[in-house]
């Protein structure tokens, strides 16, 4: 029921911006677990998927960046909901400003265990083997893994901000900015904390928080970028 309440809040927020937004960018981890079989997708998320479809039917671009909980998005969201899928970081210009958008997993993180897991999750061979398991068991396994991942966090939240000299995404961004000084805004998900940090006179890095605990999002009005909350 808690998850259903969070979903309704997110859907109500998307409904409130459908006549104002020219594009919506979802930076990953929108699902606890998502895996597409050839003819089967996980049950649930009905209201959310319906709202995405409504937005795209209205002509609003919806961009979906795969996160580490929804790595295995196939073509269902694009074919059925009209969503544009991104599996890598995107650099794009919006109203004259340069944006670097990414989920953020694997960027600047030296953790060898995480790198191994990420390689396994992206392995087409392992995905083929996983697809051979009946969804009755494979989806249950995926949901159990996601639940275990959540329960490792304190109060269901990610560790607090570690400071700009320790936060992997900030360190990665600083290094990337050296060779791409024209980028104005770096925006990430993944860490599930709220952060808005100036890196130079013309560049900022934002981590968006999430839609489970913070109900946070960024909005760009053509001139300025704001980190806000819809609850």
Task: Please state what every model-predicted region is.
Residues 23, 97, 203:
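Conserved catalytic motifs of the protein kinase core domain
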Residues 2-94:
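Core catalytic region of metal-dependent phosphoesterases/phosphodiesterases
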Residues 82-87, 100, 105, 109-117, ...:
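Conserved beta-sheet core of the metallophosphoesterase superfamily
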Residues 104-168:
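Active-site-proximal loop/helix segment associated with metal-binding centers of metalloenzymes
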Residues 24-31, 59-65, 99-103, 121-129, ...:
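Low-complexity, flexible helical/coil segments
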């Amino acid at each position: 029921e808690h998850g259903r309440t969070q979903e309704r809040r997110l859907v109500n927020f998307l409904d409130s911006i459908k006549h104002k937004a020219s594009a919506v960018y979802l930076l990953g981890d929108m699902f606890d677990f998502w895996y597409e079989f050839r003819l089967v997708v996980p049950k649930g998320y009905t209201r959310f998927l319906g709202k995405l479809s409504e937005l795209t039917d209205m002509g609003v671009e919806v961009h979906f960046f795969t996160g580490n909980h929804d790595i295995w998005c196939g073509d269902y969201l694009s074919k059925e909901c009209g969503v544009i899928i991104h599996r890598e970081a995107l650099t794009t210009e919006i109203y004259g400003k340069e944006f670097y958008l990414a989920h953020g997993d694997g960027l600047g993180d030296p953790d060898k265990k995480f790198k191994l897991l990420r390689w396994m999750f992206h392995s087409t061979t392992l995905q083929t083997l996983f697809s051979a398991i009946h969804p009755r068991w494979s989806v249950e396994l995926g949901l159990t893994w996601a639940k275990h991942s959540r329960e490792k966090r304190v109060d269901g939240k990610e560790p607090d901000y570690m400071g700009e000299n320790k936060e992997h995404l900030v360190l990665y961004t600083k290094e990337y900015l050296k060779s791409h000084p024209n980028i104005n805004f770096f925006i990430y998900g993944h860490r599930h904390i709220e952060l808005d940090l100036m890196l130079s006179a013309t560049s900022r890095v934002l981590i968006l928080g999430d839609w489970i605990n913070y109900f946070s999002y960024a909005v760009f009005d053509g001139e300025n970028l704001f980190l806000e909350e819809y609850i």
